[in-house]
Amino acid sequence: MATTVHLSSFSLFIQSRGRRDNSISSVKSLKKRTGLSPSSALTSQGGRDMIPPEGKCNDHNSAFDFKLYMIRKAESVNAALDVSVPLREPLTVQEAVRYSLLAGGKRVRPLLCIAVCELVGGDEATAMSAACAVEMIHTSSLIHDDLPCMDNADLRRGKPTNHKVYGEDMAVLAGDALLALAFEHMTVVSSGLVAPERMIRAVVELARAIGTTGLVAGQMIDLASERLNPDKVGLEHLEFIHLHKTAALLEAAAVLGVIMGGGTEEEIEKLRKYARCIGLLFQVVDDILDVTKSTEELGKTAGKDVMAGKLTYPRLIGLERSKEVAEKLRREAEEQLLGFDPSKAAPLVALASYIACRHN
């Protein structure tokens, strides 16, 4: 590992001041933030709260065709992303950007942004620039995460990673370019559609989600945690990593959806909590899949977290208890949607179930 981070920085980080008002202020306040304490997620009896067996994953909301909804939203997002990154000089970096950005993927984050915007009274067109911005940043983070100095991954979305095709130098530049493009795209395309004060808030929310109070913090602690003895690391430590590294961008996607749709402060907080729950859920399931599925099924290298000595939920609490945590988080996410129009909330209920039951 080329990057060395000392674990003492973890304790210093969580004691630091100056975080955003709505940020995760301490790994010990998980219950306050999401309604789920580390221990409460492990209290299901007799395995009854585990992830539903294959074939039953759609029972939570069988009347809503989430598969069709997801396909249609992904098509809309893909078309908007394609237009946002035309081929132009310098061609090599533009090709590298397009290679990763248009490589497919589930588009969970832009879908979340759009679904939330529609939930609070907005529409897809109003949310699309923010949805694309979130996906650009997500792709940027994947390009950088896959680098040899980070996770050293060879496959992403079933294809060779960006640095394997274009080289490490070009991959770094492509990731940087996507990060800058995200903010330019959201502000320029939304001009005239969203009030300036709301756009300023959206920019701040997104910036905080990916900086040292968000994604960067999670990645730093993740790197520092490699090869740690799981017996000496608590569940709160792992949740801190993933509330920042994974959930922070999902949280931003949801909050941006509310902002773009003209939602209220109360709606922002409810959907912020929903996103935190599905963010943790996404990572728990990701850890489970890493040790239960093949490389072909995942579209990325299976077992790489184990080989890298990373902290994961199965490593820390075991496979069965990880499944219990996942189901608990799914239910907690759905509870945040109570009080909304059920028909408009249906995509978000189905999204939580989809994340819990996905196979890649």
From Swiss-Prot:
It is an enzyme of class 2 (transferase). Mainly expressed in roots. GO terms for biological process: carotenoid biosynthetic process; farnesyl diphosphate biosynthetic process; geranyl diphosphate biosynthetic process; geranylgeranyl diphosphate biosynthetic process. It holds the Pfam family polyprenyl_synt. SUPFAM superfamilies: Terpenoid synthases. Mg(2+) 1 binds at D145, D151. Mg(2+) 2 binds at D145, D151. It catalyses: isopentenyl diphosphate + dimethylallyl diphosphate = (2E)-geranyl diphosphate + diphosphate; isopentenyl diphosphate + (2E)-geranyl diphosphate = (2E,6E)-farnesyl diphosphate + diphosphate; isopentenyl diphosphate + (2E,6E)-farnesyl diphosphate = (2E,6E,10E)-geranylgeranyl diphosphate + diphosphate. Pathway: Isoprenoid biosynthesis; farnesyl diphosphate biosynthesis; farnesyl diphosphate from geranyl diphosphate and isopentenyl diphosphate: step 1/1; Isoprenoid biosynthesis; geranyl diphosphate biosynthesis; geranyl diphosphate from dimethylallyl diphosphate and isopentenyl diphosphate: step 1/1; Isoprenoid biosynthesis; geranylgeranyl diphosphate biosynthesis; geranylgeranyl diphosphate from farnesyl diphosphate and isopentenyl diphosphate: step 1/1. Its EC number is 2.5.1.-, 2.5.1.1, 2.5.1.29, 2.5.1.10. It is found in: Plastid, Chloroplast. Residues 24-54 are annotated as: Disordered. InterPro entries: Isoprenoid_synthase_dom_sf, Polyprenyl_synt, Polyprenyl_synt_CS, Prenyl_diphosphate_synthase. Binds 2 Mg(2+) ions per subunit. Residues 1-39 form a transit peptide. The keyword Nucleus does not apply. Keywords: Carotenoid biosynthesis, Chloroplast, Isoprene biosynthesis, Magnesium, Metal-binding, Plastid, Transferase, Transit peptide. Its cofactor is Mg(2+). Belongs to the FPP/GGPP synthase family. Catalyzes the trans-addition of the three molecules of IPP onto DMAPP to form geranylgeranyl pyrophosphate. This is Geranylgeranyl pyrophosphate synthase 3, chloroplastic.
